[in-house]
Amino acid sequence: MKKSMLKNGLLLGLFALLCTGLVAIVNQLTYAKIKQQEQIELSRVLHQIIPDEIHDNELTEHCITIQDSDFLGTTQPLPAYIATRNGDGVAIAIETVAPDGYNGNIKIIIGLNKAGEVLGVRTLSHQETPGLGDKIELRKSDWVTKFNGLTVSSEKDKRWHVKKDGGQIDQFTGATITPRAYVNAVKLATLYFNEHKQKLLSAPASCEVDNE
């Protein structure tokens, strides 16, 4: 009887061990696949906001970490990606956060050239209202392309407001909070770059990039 119980216990233990091992293997494979897809999507977005013809490096491989709660909307460190040509920094893609969206944080990435001109803007994540605030997604609206070619002269640059507030950027029909927060976030991130451009464009890669 005792031998039978011991045998059954060993079998159950072995079965549990095998199941745990299989789950760990599946999780590892799934994680690697997810990370690979994230890198592919990141590379796609980066090449949308920084034209291929102005740089000769792979943007995801020159990542630096930036942090400034006053200009980047969060106390957390954020990645930025340096575009180089012949080893010289020519543009940057900066991740930033609009903390005051209608439904919370809006994560944004902005491409800027050395002159501080906006090359492109994309929304990385948000929880804005479908049909209203989600016009910040390129697949829903071309609104984010309105930033292309813009520069910021100072924090008081009056152009950098939605038209309802006296600026030059359109708001959405039935939604003002989302575009207002978005415009301010892009403006502040651009000002951050203008203030630190020499240091940023010459910075060596300093954050880990998972290329699995």
UniProtKB/Swiss-Prot annotation:
Coiled-coil regions, chain positions: none
EC class name: translocase
EC number: 7.-.-.-
Residues that bear FMN phosphoryl threonine: T176
GO cellular component: a single term: plasma membrane
GO molecular function: electron transfer activity; FMN binding
Keyword Electron transport annotated: yes
Keywords, sorted A to Z: Cell inner membrane, Cell membrane, Electron transport, Flavoprotein, FMN, Membrane, Phosphoprotein, Translocase, Transmembrane, Transmembrane helix, Transport
Cited Pfam families: FMN_bind
UniProt topology in membrane: Single-pass membrane protein
Assembly and oligomerization: The complex is composed of six subunits: RnfA, RnfB, RnfC, RnfD, RnfE and RnfG.
Function: Part of a membrane-bound complex that couples electron transfer with translocation of ions across the membrane.
Protein's recorded name: Ion-translocating oxidoreductase complex subunit G
